[in-house]
Amino acid sequence: KYEAAGQRDIVEISVSTRPDCIKTAYLDILEEVHQKTGVAVNLELGLQTANYHTLDKINRGHGLAEFIDGVLQIKEYRGFTICTHVILNLPGDTLRDAEETARILTALKIDIVKLHSLYIAKNTELCEWYENGRIAVCSKEEYFDRVIAFLELIPEGMAVERLFSRVPEEEAVFSNWGTSWWKLKDELMERMEGQHSYQGKRCHY
């Protein structure tokens, strides 16, 4: 039944899902896999933002409460880690939303976080809003401010596996302010050094 997971070279199973799709029956299966094979289990949940007004606007179909409920269900099981996906420049969000999201992930003791810079794919409703001027994307500098504030409010031990998204240029009408992700990373690191900023600087627990 769990033959594939028990192969010698497999050390972890990572399952990406929505927070409102977390069910005890699914977690029981993953726990059985973990116990019988010793393979680690990582669950990746897409929160995107703690601002439920924004989540509603972009038709996520869930709010912050569902995310918290899903995390608490997972934490009843031993041997599971939780990775959360966050977008810090969603239309309508502010610096305060980035800070609130960081504080919530810290309070919930999330293990891993992946930050995504918003990209707007062609032929989507968001693309239509963007081209019609219904939404605007914050500046690169404002995104840096949000990332820095976010990082300062999460603990040093929370692994950060991503800072920017990537998508082929031909598939999007907006992506990373027309700049390559590695250049953005270098700019961000330079700004953090200049501000004497670091992960966990304002995290007190």
Residue ranges and their predicted role:
Residues 1-72, 76-77:
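Conserved SAM/AdoMet-binding glycine-rich loop
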Residues 1-7, 65-84, 108, 135-157:
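Alpha-helix-loop-beta-strand connector modules within alpha/beta enzyme cores
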Residues 10-16, 40-44, 81-85, 112-114, ...:
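Structural preference for beta-strand elements that scaffold enzyme active sites
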Residues 16-20, 46, 50-52, 74-97, ...:
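Conserved strand-turn element in the central/C-terminal portion of the radical SAM core barrel
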Residues 25-30, 91-107, 170:
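Catalytic cores of alpha/beta
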Residues 28-30, 58-61, 98-99, 128-129, ...:
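Short, glycine/charged-enriched secondary-structure capping and boundary segments
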Residues 58-66, 93-100, 134-142, 180-183:
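Alpha-helix N-cap and loop-to-helix initiation/capping positions
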Residues 106, 112, 119-205:
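Auxiliary Fe-S-binding modules of radical SAM enzymes
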